[in-house]
């Protein structure tokens, strides 16, 4: 990556400094026995001390504490024992209205809870999980948050990687950033061809395409709650940049994808059985790692509006 694209000092003083671990030492926050500990210098936090039984909700003060932590850190990893699988919907509901996630290329497997679906490696493993993406970025209004619960996890492998698109923006050279802010990108569910793979019948494929036409969005956008700028492009769904030639568009997108993929702005979550997780789908991108062979991996998932 060109050094011209990286400017480590151009950072928002009100937010944790990117690439500065010292800012995170001793940064634990606690309220009513619930603690937040930074997971890495750039994205994520551990949550400890919260217990949900499916009936008694936490106090409103604790709920707001967790919500603010989610906006600040990008994702929250809840320790095993925080919630049982049957109460996962309660955890998701703390952050908004939970609903079933369904996409045209991967129809949802519905759990007993109509707001929760299952990702089961013994039922289906899809390549799209191993490409950096924002959930449903092909829609005008993707879910605000995504939540997962590890019901069955491999003894090794099967991690989930997260990257912070706001932190990636902060690494841009100011001149390049200003140019990017003038551009618009096209996002399409068919960018990687997964819709064609899912629907072999031409009429059915055409019907699905009609339901999910390409959409346009600013290449650099403001987070609607924090007001911070972020790179809004992802490998799975971003097709091209309007107004540029094919080669120029692809070249510029690769520069942005390199920033998104940079280890400087990402972290890796190793699953344990019973781990629950929620992330801000508007600024945090993710991808799976398919290194667990034939081991069983079963996660519950909900998206939150």
State the predicted function of each range.
Residues 2-276, 282-305:
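Non-heme Fe(II) oxygenase catalytic core, chiefly the N-lobe of the double-stranded beta-helix
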């Amino acid at each position: 990556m060109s050094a011209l694209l990286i400017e480590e000092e151009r950072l928002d003083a009100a937010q944790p400094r990117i690439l500065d671990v010292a800012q995170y030492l001793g940064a634990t926050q606690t309220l009513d026995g619930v603690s937040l500990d930074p997971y890495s210098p750039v994205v994520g936090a551990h949550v400890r001390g919260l217990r949900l039984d499916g009936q008694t909700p936490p106090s409103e003060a604790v709920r707001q504490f967790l919500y603010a932590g989610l906006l600040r850190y990008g994702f929250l990893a809840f320790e095993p024992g925080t919630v049982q699988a049957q109460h996962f919907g309660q955890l998701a509901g703390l952050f908004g209205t939970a609903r079933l996630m369904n996409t045209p290329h991967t129809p949802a497997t519905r759990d007993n809870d109509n707001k929760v679906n299952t990702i089961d490696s013994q039922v289906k493993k899809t390549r799209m999980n191993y490409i950096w993406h924002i959930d449903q970025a092909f829609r005008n209004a993707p879910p605000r948050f995504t939540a997962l619960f590890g019901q069955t996890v491999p003894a090794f492998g099967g991690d989930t990687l997260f990257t912070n698109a706001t932190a990636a923006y902060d690494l841009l050279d100011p001149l390049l950033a200003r140019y990017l802010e003038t551009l618009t990108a096209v996002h399409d569910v068919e960018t990687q061809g997964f819709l064609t793979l899912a629907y072999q019948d031409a009429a059915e494929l055409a019907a699905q395409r009609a339901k999910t036409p390409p959409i346009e969005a600013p290449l650099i956008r403001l987070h609607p709650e924090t007001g911070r700028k972020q790179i809004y492009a992802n490998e799975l769904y971003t097709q091209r940049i309007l107004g540029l030639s094919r080669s120029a568009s692809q070249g510029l997108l690769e520069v942005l994808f390199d920033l998104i993929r940079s280890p400087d702005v990402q972290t890796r979550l190793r699953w344990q059985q019973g781990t629950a997780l929620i992330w801000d789908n508007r600024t945090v991108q993710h991808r799976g790692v398919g290194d667990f062979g034939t081991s069983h991996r079963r996660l519950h998932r909900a998206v939150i509006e």
